[in-house]
Each structure stands twice: as C-alpha cells, then as structure tokens.
Amino acid sequence: MDRKELELYLNDLLQAARFRDYCPNGLQVQGRDPIAHIVTGVTASLALIEAAIDVRADAILVHHGYFWKGEDARVIGQKHARLKQLLAHDVNLFAYHLPLDAHPTLGNNAQLGALLGIQPTGRFGDDELGWIGTLPEATTLGAFAEVVAARLDRMPLVIGGADRPVHTIGWCTGGAQGWFDAAVSAGVDVYLSGEASEQTTHLARESGVAYIGAGHHATERGGVRALGNHLAEHFGVRHTFIDIPNPV
C-alpha cells in the first residue's frame, strides 16, 4: 500500500489531530514506498529497528517514537544510531502515543481491559484516557493480581491487602500513576497503571484504594499489536509484532 494512504488512514482511525501530545503523531521518519510488510512494537528502540530490518519490514509502527517535547534536538548518540539504521535501510517509522492509548477498541486501555476481563463502564481524566470498569464477579485484590500476572507474564507491584475485596477497577496503561488521585475520586476499588512513584504508596494507604503497577511496557503491548492486526486484515499487508522484553 501507499505510504501516504497508510498515514491518512491511521490519522483518521486514531483521531490523532484531537490530542495535545508530547510528541508528533503519525509518520516520523520517511522511508520507501510502497509498504507491504509492517512490524509493530512498543518502542522504536535500536533492537526493534534491527529486528525489523532482519525481517525486511517496509515500515515500523510503535507507541513510543521520537522527537519528544523537551528532548535534546541534536542527532547524536542513541538518536543518531537509531535514525542511521532507519535511513540507511529506507524504513518508515510511524508512531502514535496518546491516540493509541485512547482508541475505544484498538487502544492500549481497551486491549488491556479485555485481556483482564474487565467490562468498561466509564472514563475519567484528560481526554478521557483513564478507564473504569467492573469485574464479572467481585474478587480479592490478591486473586485479581494473580490474573494480571498471568495475562501479562510479569509479577506486578501490588499495594494493598491481598484479602481486600475488589469489583470496580480503574486503569490507564503506561506511566499514568499521576492519575491515581482522579481514579480515587472516581470511586474505584483498585487503580492499575504501568509504573509507580514514591508517593503512590502513601496515596494507596491513605485513600483506601489499592494500586497495581503492572509494567509500563507490559501494559502497552496490546494496542500496537491490535492495530497491526487490523491493518493486515483491512489492507492485506503483512504484519509482524516483535516484542523486545523490558522489565520496566
């Protein structure tokens, strides 16, 4: 398919223009045309780029791309190494950050909720990026944490008593521990995100709302993989999801 056609389709599907983001969404590095093979991954790391080159991908589609607000604009060091490989092999790089968190079916939050068996009931936070939902049956924090560990193949950080009853879940993938306060105000029993900060522990203890830190990378694998599968089905392109392990 044509590179411009893909970019326009993704921008429209993910409603990229409506988000005030920390980075440019869409095509970040131009490569060859046409595009027949797309590799997806969470972050445009050098390891992902090299893996995509090895399988002869025409484009890479990620959640974490480049050119973040406030970063050093010089093309040196790590940035040089990554861009050098993309440009030398004429590989396109597409990146969608907040738009890929928010999509109602393909987004990170939608995919994580489905993976954990949560029925969505509402949203909260800026651009309604935070999600609220309920479990089919009330359970305990310990039992729910076991489900999280099994589905994400990673032991989560759990703040709260294992026997605490939970039914209403708030969640936002990635580094959204800063939205814990908003989740508490929304009346959830437990809030789940990817990371935790020092103050997260105190808020959990003092609010009575449990917290689960399930991994920034682990909670954000679903969206880009689902989006790649959608593109393969819609356009008939080849799609390969490559997971570069990350313990954070």
Curated annotation (Swiss-Prot):
UniProt xrefs under SUPFAM superfamilies: NIF3 (NGG1p interacting factor 3)-like (SSF102705)
Protein's UniProt keywords contain Zinc-finger: no
Amino-acid positions noted as binding a divalent metal cation 2 in the UniProt annotation, renumbered to this chain: H64, H216, E220
Protein name: GTP cyclohydrolase 1 type 2 homolog
PANTHER family per UniProt: GTP CYCLOHYDROLASE 1 TYPE 2 HOMOLOG (PTHR13799:SF14), NGG1 INTERACTING FACTOR 3 (PTHR13799)
A Gene Ontology term for the protein's cellular component: cytoplasm
Chain positions recorded as a divalent metal cation 1 binding sites: H63, D101, E220
Membership in a protein family: Belongs to the GTP cyclohydrolase I type 2/NIF3 family.
Subunit structure: Homohexamer.
Database matches in Gene3D superfamilies: NIF3 (NGG1p interacting factor 3)-like (3.40.1390.30)
Residues annotated as signal peptide: none
Pfam family, one: DUF34_NIF3
Keyword Protein biosynthesis: no
Gene Ontology terms, MF aspect: metal ion binding
InterPro entries xrefs: DUF34/NIF3, DUF34/NIF3_sf
Keyword annotations: Metal-binding
